[in-house]
Amino acid sequence: MNKALFLCLVVLCAAVVFAAEDLQKAKHAPFKRGAAGAAICICPDKVGRGDLWLFRGDCPGGYGYTSDCYVWPNICCYPH
C-alpha cells in the first residue's frame, strides 16, 4: 500500500470517528419543539403556559420544571 492511500484511509477513519461523536452528543440532547422558541401548551388545571416537549414520558431535568400534564403523545411542563 502506498503512503498516499494509507494517509487517505487514516483521514477517512478520523472523520468517521469525529462524526460519530457529534451524532452521539446530538442524540442525548433533549428535543424541544421549535428551534428558536418552544411551542407553548396550556393544561386545564394550571395557570399560565408551559413548554411542550415532543414524545417524552416525563419532563427533562435541569430546566426548573415542577409540574406537568400529558398532551398525548407529548408532555407539557410547568413553570414556563
From Swiss-Prot:
Disulfide bonds join C41-C76, C43-C69, C59-C77. Its main location: secreted. Keywords: Cleavage on pair of basic residues, Disulfide bond, Hypotensive agent, Ion channel impairing toxin, Nematocyst, Neurotoxin, Potassium channel impairing toxin, Secreted, Signal, Toxin, Voltage-gated potassium channel impairing toxin. Residues 1-19 form the signal peptide. One of its GO terms (cellular component) is extracellular region. Residues 20-31 form a propeptide. The keyword Signal applies. GO terms for biological process: regulation of blood pressure. It is found in: Secreted; Nematocyst. InterPro entries: BDS_K_chnl_tox, Myo_ane_neurotoxin_sf. GO terms for molecular function: ion channel inhibitor activity; potassium channel regulator activity; toxin activity. Moderately expressed in the ectodermal tissue from the distal and proximal tentacles, body wall, and oral disk. Belongs to the sea anemone type 3 (BDS) potassium channel toxin family. Blocks Kv3 voltage-gated potassium channels. Reduces blood pressure. This is Kappa-actitoxin-Avd4f.
